[in-house]
């Protein structure tokens, strides 16, 4: 594996849930736009030139073209390439067209140094859970096979393993085991990152690091049997990818984003 490249910084944000108009999407929630703006301001201040910002799904609560355009306006403050995925709340076709028309990536692959970043579409029309279609699974394998000298990071919206919250584990990636079985066949796959769970997660499947990310909006209570909110700050994940295949990561919580209604 070549090691002549510099290290790569990738930032993950997820589950922005922008509504039809700025403001809370439901009672007790903070303003989705204000939360996102605070996260992006912090991100831009803390990281002046990331190599890529990945937005891993549930981009919109109301999946309409003007909402995705408003999200893109928010993201325009970032001095970095952007790639996104659809989640269960999104309209994949509208979201994809909006991002591509704006010059950003959606699904697909991107080479950064000697790393290959792959976005997998797990959106499944009519379902809260996710599905990696046979076409997507084959695309992922083909992409990895075309880059035998690159380390691999896979991004998907739905969690590929149970995360310890019963209600969330029922709506994860329905064929996550199949995806992981395929990824395990390729020694250069180092990590799989995901959104959907509105909380940090850090686990392993064999040699593959599995990482979940806080939402820019509200957080879900870890280890909860039923839906429950956690009064924690919004956040994002920082990933540092090294030429030798090492990965370092941390979650950044953004001061001032703790939902007031959940802490009173």
Tell where the protein language model's regions lie, with residue ranges.
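N-terminal active-site segment of His-dependent metallophosphoesterases
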Residues: 1-70, 146, 163
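Active-site-proximal beta-strand elements of phosphoester/diester hydrolases
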Residues: 7-21, 114-124, 153-155, 208-214, ...
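Acidic/histidine-rich helix-loop elements
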Residues: 14-35, 61, 91-104, 125-134, ...
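Active-site glycine-centered loops adjacent to acidic/histidine catalytic or metal-binding residues
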Residues: 15, 57-58, 87, 120, ...
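Binuclear metal-dependent phosphoesterase catalytic core
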Residues: 30, 182, 201-264
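His/acidic metal-ligating clusters that form di-metal
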Residues: 38-52, 129-211, 245-248, 257, ...
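Metal-dependent catalytic neighborhoods of phosphoester/phosphodiester hydrolases
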Residues: 55-76, 91-104, 130, 165-167, ...
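A short, structured active-site edge motif that brings together acidic residues
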Residues: 82-93
């Amino acid at each position: 594996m070549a090691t002549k490249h510099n290290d790569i910084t990738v930032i993950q944000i997820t589950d922005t849930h922008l509504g039809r108009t700025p403001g809370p999407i439901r009672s007790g929630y903070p303003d989705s736009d204000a939360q996102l703006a605070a996260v992006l301001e912090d991100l831009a201040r803390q990281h002046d030139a990331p190599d890529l910002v990945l937005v891993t799904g549930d981009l919109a609560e109301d999946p309409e073209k003007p909402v995705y355009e408003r999200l893109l306006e928010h993201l325009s403050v970032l001095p970095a390439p952007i790639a996104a995925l659809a989640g269960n709340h999104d309209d994949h076709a509208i979201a994809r067209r909006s991002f591509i028309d704006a010059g950003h990536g959606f699904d697909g692959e991107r080479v950064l140094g000697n790393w290959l970043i792959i976005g997998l579409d797990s959106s499944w029309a009519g379902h809260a859970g996710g599905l990696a279609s046979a076409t997507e699974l084959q695309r992922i394998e083909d992409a990895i096979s075309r880059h035998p000298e690159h380390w691999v990071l896979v991004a998907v919206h739905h969690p590929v393993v149970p995360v310890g919250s019963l209600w969330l584990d029922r709506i994860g990636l329905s064929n996550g085991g199949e995806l992981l079985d395929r990824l395990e066949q390729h020694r250069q796959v180092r990590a799989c990152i995901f959104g959907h769970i509105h909380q940090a997660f850090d686990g392993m499947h064999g040699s593959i690091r599995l990482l979940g990310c806080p939402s820019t909006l509200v957080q879900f209570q870890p280890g909860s049997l039923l839906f429950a909110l956690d009064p924690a700050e919004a956040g994002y994940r920082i990933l540092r990818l090294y030429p030798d295949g090492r990965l370092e990561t941390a979650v950044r919580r953004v001061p001032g984003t703790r939902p007031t209604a959940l802490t009173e």
